[in-house]
Structure formats: structure tokens, C-alpha cells
């Protein structure tokens, strides 16, 4: 993607990320969603939400209020599955490899009801681009 650095959106329920993490460098506007109130710092805005009461809805509403209309989600299985289950996605890039892993975390599960789907092969990897119905 070309253009300016995107606004970083971080979920840190208990503010457990190390203070020396790059996300705290202040170089890029950053929103941190947390349960703990915290004063703003240079380019860092802390947004307090209740993680026990539909946190994704609160996050999406807070981003909408700040006129953010596009969100690229990178995360682990639980976060990605939550976005999928709550139908909070329009398109997805899925990378698959034919190699079998015998342990680890399973990938998020999606149904196959896509309005649009492309599959491309790169050496041993398969890339899927899909849009939701």
C-alpha cells in the first residue's frame, strides 16, 4: 500500500505491552484500546472500553466517531475469528501453504459464501483474495 503510514490501532486490555515497544515511539498516530484510563502522549490516544461487553462494537464505534472508515486487522486466531464471527469484515487475504504443521494454533475458520474470490499460486504458496457476500 502506498501513502502515509496508517493510524495504528492496538488492543491492550491491561496495558501490558512493554513501554519500549515501537508502537509507543510517537512517530505515527496510535489508538490504544484498554480498560485502564491513561493520559494521552505524543501521537498516542488511549481509548477506554469495557472488554467484557462486546469490545469489537465499541472499537468500531470509536473509530467511526474519529472518521476512520477502513481497518486492516492483523492478529492472532482469536482476534481474527472475532471479526469474522461478528461479520466485521469486507475482504480478506488468506495465505496457504501445502506443508502440514502437526502442532500450533489453527487458522480462523470462514464459510465459503464469498461474492468474489481469486486464487493465485506462488511457488508452494496459495494466496486467496475473497470478498464477503
Predicted regions and their residues:
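Enzymes that bind and transform nitrogen-containing heteroaromatic metabolites
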Residues: 1-133
Amino acid at each position: 500500500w502506498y501513502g502515509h503510514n496508517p493510524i495504528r490501532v492496538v488492543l491492550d486490555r491491561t496495558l501490558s505491552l512493554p513501554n519500549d515497544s515501537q508502537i509507543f515511539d510517537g512517530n505515527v498516530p496510535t489508538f490504544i484500546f484498554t480498560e485502564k484510563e491513561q493520559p494521552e502522549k505524543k501521537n498516542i490516544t488511549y481509548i477506554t472500553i469495557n472488554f467484557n461487553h462486546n469490545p469489537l462494537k465499541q472499537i468500531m464505534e470509536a473509530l467511526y466517531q474519529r472518521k476512520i472508515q477502513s481497518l486492516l486487522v492483523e492478529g492472532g486466531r482469536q482476534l481474527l475469528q472475532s471479526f469474522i464471527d461478528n461479520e466485521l469484515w469486507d475482504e480478506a487475504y488468506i495465505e496457504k501453504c501445502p506443508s502440514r504443521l502437526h502442532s500450533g494454533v489453527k487458522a480462523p475458520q470462514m464459510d465459503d459464501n464469498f461474492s468474489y474470490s481469486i486464487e493465485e499460486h506462488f511457488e508452494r504458496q496459495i494466496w486467496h483474495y475473497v470478498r464477503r457476500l
